[in-house]
Amino acid sequence: HLRPGGREFLSSLCEMGFPGSLADSLNERVHWDEEESGVLSDTGWRYERFPVCHTPETDPHGYELIHETGFRLLHCGDSGPCEEIEKRASSADVVILEMGMPDIGEFPHHHRPSDVISFEERHPEVKILVTHNYSSGKGNESGFPIPNLPNSIHQLEDGDTLEIDRNGNFIMIGKS
């Protein structure tokens, strides 16, 4: 699954990096899907790609994933606060926000801790997971310290798991 025009773009990058060696594999072994929305085979999931707020050169988009149980996951991509995220958040069960900058200035293309807290206050019924975190992970003393966010907001670490059952109920399991 990739953006419209992505097959041509990725194929040309592969040709530049590995001339003549990947074309057959890309044509014969890869199933390309460049649709903006659709169904993920026999998984019970469908998706919709939507625009978010980041530098246009990065083709900024997020994905709304909807399970046949009604469970909705909103992955906002690399983005700052924006109307499209706000519009979709009210119907989501879980929202994944990137938090790429600390509260040291204005950064319209990234969420800061204050933006994430404000989002949580507007959408208290939604489980918020933070990724693309500017801060260091737990137990790492270098870099920016982990910001103090409300307990309702989970700052993802490598190894964390979101388990969704057959009824659309979910639990967040932190790494050991």
Label each region the model flagged.
Residues V95-E98, D115:
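Metal-dependent phosphoesterases centered on the DNase I-like endonuclease/exonuclease/phosphatase
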Residues A92:
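An anion/phosphate-binding loop that grips the pyrophosphate of nucleotide cofactors and donors
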Residues R112-P113, H132-G139:
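Small/polar glycine-rich anion-binding or flexible loop at a beta-alpha turn
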Residues H1-L74, G80-C82, K87, E121-K127, ...:
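Binuclear metal-dependent hydrolase catalytic cores
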Residues M101-I104:
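A short, flexible beta-alpha/helix-coil linker loop
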Residues E106-H110, N140-E141:
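Short, solvent-exposed loop/turn segments at secondary-structure boundaries
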Residues P108-S118:
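Charged helix-capping and loop-helix junction motifs
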Residues C76-G77, L97-M99, T131:
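Active-site flanking residues adjacent to catalytic metal/cofactor-binding acidic residues
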